[in-house]
Amino acid sequence: MLGLIFRNRFVPFSEQEMQPEFLAVRERVSALGDAGDDVELYKTMIEGMARMYLGAWDEGIEVASILDINLAGKLYEPGATVPVEIASLYEHEVPLEGRYAVQVRFLDPSEEPIYESDLLMLEGLAAVSTEVVIPREADSGRYLVEYSLWEEDASDPIVRTSRSIYVIEAFEERITAMLFDSRRPQLRRQVGRSSSRALANTTVLWHLDMYQRGRREWLAGAYMGYPVIMNQIFEQGTLMVEPMQFDSEIELAEEFINDLGSGRDPLSTRSGDMRLAYRSSVDRELVPFRLFVPDNYDRSQSYPLVVALHGAGGDENTFMESFDGTFKENARDRGYIVASVNGRGPYGGYRDASAQDVIDVLDLVQRVYPIDETRTYLMGHSMGGGGTVRIGFEHADRFAALAPIAGYGSAEDLAKAPEMPLFIAQGELDALVPVERARNFHEAAQALGMPSLHYVENEGTDHVAIVAEVMDQIFDWFDLHRR
């Protein structure tokens, strides 16, 4: 069951009860968005979420929605100081009736506290600055700067959430060495030898850019960059994902540089989960994607391929890290190569450059890996489900079957390739994509007489949980279909 921890109690999300409130808030948000009033838009969204999920909107919740925690960077060495600022997102229009305090804790990779500040009383909602010091003996890993807001004399916090940082031993030395080695002439000569080596090189360039950015800015992954009150909601769900595992993936970049510099192809025999990057055919930007290659990978064999499209707010990590691991698990067990695209951001909508990202990744993976082009499939969730329908039917000659989850298209999409095998999945209690729309889409497919059509509607299932529930069935469906 999905929910959130707020004021020390678990509040379940009841999508069926949310529907009227959700629709009303959506109408207000839409009107404010058209008016261009970002502050009122944010306040309305937060108030609506609080009323829907908590049944209340009081001063403490409003203060929690106004304050946010800011960190100066994402990546640090042992012994470094991490500046922390708690500041208001906008001004509170009337004097506060209550008194409030914030507390900052620093948690190690096992989420045990290393440091805990005193309660820092707020003067109105003026910014509070503090810092945490990373121990010199700290191991590499993911650490948390935890923030909590308290009403004076309360026994429990109003809200508690965190921002993550990564500690990497000898970070500055390693980045400097990689920057130097990546510019060596012998490495650059390798790039033009094959598409595989070129992909390894653009992957290195993207990783170096991310590590340099992480020195000077806090990098958020899917659903992580929201203000703390929203962040806490997403923490209790299943979609929050780091942009990358900085402490371990630095080794991947180092290995790629060493292999290329020694004349070896880093991707020729490598299996497992990899974060790769290529240059977009649209604007030459470096764009990441995730790729999973099954164990015992053998270039003399051909492999089926699934390309997955994330939903709104997600990124290339969503399918690989969320949904109870069912996406990679099926790929591993069945011997599939699977790719999860970035879509040019969390809200690209799989149109224009966002749609081209899907085709670029498909083309690239088919060039670099021995893919069975008669067994290439497309699937997606929510916004990615709509993208699956739109792109899949537009490029019907590229795919053997499609599987949109909690996303749909139009009868016009279906008419482009009515022979396309189509698996449609929907949760009955979906508050974001009403079940009626999925049923209507299924009926449109039936009206076309599509010869290979399967519809799954799970009772009592919401917008997110449906993905893991149907993943095995989708791969079963893919197993049955060739182009």
List PLM regions with ranges.
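Short, compositionally biased P/S/T/A/G/V-rich stretches that sit at domain boundaries
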Residues: 46-80, 87-91, 182
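Short, surface-exposed loop/turn segments at beta-strand-coil junctions that are enriched for proline
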Residues: 93, 133-140, 294-298
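Gly/Ser-rich "nucleophile elbow"/oxyanion-hole loop immediately N-terminal to the catalytic nucleophile
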Residues: 295-301, 349-383, 393-396
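Primarily recognizes the serine-hydrolase "nucleophile elbow" in alpha/beta-hydrolase
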Residues: 314, 319, 367, 374-418
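Short beta-strand/loop motif that positions the catalytic acidic residue
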Residues: 418, 423-426, 430
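C-terminal catalytic histidine-bearing segment of alpha/beta-hydrolase fold enzymes
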Residues: 431, 435-483
